[in-house]
């Protein structure tokens, strides 16, 4: 498909075309009448992409075209730089390390500032304030594993790693700021390491095929399975605050749009994001329904 949204909600959510003055504004704005929202390919960013989509459609004269399911942050970044999309959501840590190739930093405010400045100066991209939550890595185990091995922190986990089996994303295995650094800097040596896709990690830990997983703070299944999150006492993991990256020219040309998007600043905490992820991944709601419900609850869209 062309990435446009389909489904029963799309008509109902769009602004009434008879809305006075709408057509004139669209013509005046020329090719800016459409905003293309991109996302990479997992539940959380799909929900956030739907939130941005409806927020824009409900409060402006733009139509939104969706290019969801791009394969990862780098592809979204390229698409934004090349004008294929106008905005996408990503995490400050990912932007710092993977997109901008900057050295590791675990100071959340400094990371945001560095990302903001480099994105604007070198790429013409505006970085929003954090949407609120920090979706960083959190090593997690079953409560009984935590008890058996006396695990409360990352330090404990490293010490006991030779007795434990890790199930983690391939990205966690490969990214130099993740497992390779845990091994080289702290001598971590898991008994076994399995590269597993997103939800398979949880199936594996549930079935005792692995002892430890690299969860994210907002994972739906983290709370559902009642896993114990180990404290990052080493400040090992960089901050991963969700932010919107938006074409800077678009925002400069339209302060009203900038104001509307800023309504998401600080609006979503870890618990809220985790609950929205669970509504999709566990309860089977669509990302679009969940986004709509969030916007209505926050007074950012009407029923």
Predicted regions and their residues:
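Short, polar/charged alpha-helical segment
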Residues: 43-63, 176, 180, 184
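A local structural motif
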Residues: 58-68, 162-165, 183-196
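A conserved helix-loop-strand patch within extracytoplasmic ligand-binding domains
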Residues: 109-166, 248, 266-270
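Short helix-initiation/N-cap motifs at beta->coil->alpha
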Residues: 65-78, 170, 191-203
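Ligand-binding "clamshell"
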Residues: 99-128, 209, 221-235
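Short, well-ordered beta-strand elements
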Residues: 30-44, 62-68, 162-168
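Immediate post-signal peptide segment of exported/extracytoplasmic ligand-binding proteins
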Residues: 23-37, 155-165, 296-303
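C-terminal transmembrane helix and the adjacent membrane-cytosol boundary/short C-terminal tail
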Residues: 2-24
